Amino acid sequence: KSFVSYVLGNAICNGDIKSLDDKISDYVPEAKGTLYENSSFKDLTNMRAGDTNFASRKAGSATFIYAGQVIQKKKTVKEYLAESSNLKTTKKVFNYNNFLTDLVARAIDLKSPGGLKKAYQDFADKAGTSSEMFFIIDDNGWPLLHGWTYATREDFLKLGIQVSKDWNSNTCIGDYLKNIVSM
């Protein structure tokens, strides 16, 4: 989830996504007419999308069974999104769930030149990783990045060090990292 947020920051800094305040449906057409249609990237990355009536039955619950269903190929990300059609948002409280990360990843995949694969490759190159990394996609080609990024321990460390370096820099991505929660 943290790496998706980082790559989102790069997409914003590169101009592929205009701002954290943009609606997800402006980037992922399948979000139109769903519970998430008017959710901003800020809402999604901070897990405050107003989806407690869909993603869990209780605010703050992590019981949403999305991940298991998608990994076992019982449903695709797109099918889960469609199930939220015609639902209304609830109060925007923190509600941890994996689905929101994958929705943000889909937007980056659609709008970044070269897609999410290129965005992650750029991140890996900048960090100086040395081994192959990969992530899983569902049957429709939607990325599953809520927890399915694979890399060596050393490369994960290099990615973390790069995030730390960027945090401490006076750059667009540094400002994004320092201000994502308060933006």
Residue ranges and their predicted role:
Residues K1-L20, L44, V104-I108, L159-Q162:
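Active-site SXXK
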Residues S2, K18, L35-N38, I71-K75, ...:
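Soluble non-cytosolic domains of exported or imported proteins
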Residues S5, A82-S84, K88-K91, F99-T101:
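Acidic/His-rich structured neighborhood in mature extracellular/periplasmic domains
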Residues G9, A55-A59:
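Short, solvent-exposed loop/turn and secondary-structure capping segments
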Residues N14-T52, A82-N86, L110-A151:
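Active-site helix/loop module of the DD-peptidase/beta-lactamase fold
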Residues A62-N86:
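Amphipathic alpha-helical interface segments
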Residues T90-N95, A105-I108:
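Short beta-strand->loop
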Residues P113-S131, T149, R153-M183:
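Conserved active-site loop region of the serine DD-peptidase/beta-lactamase
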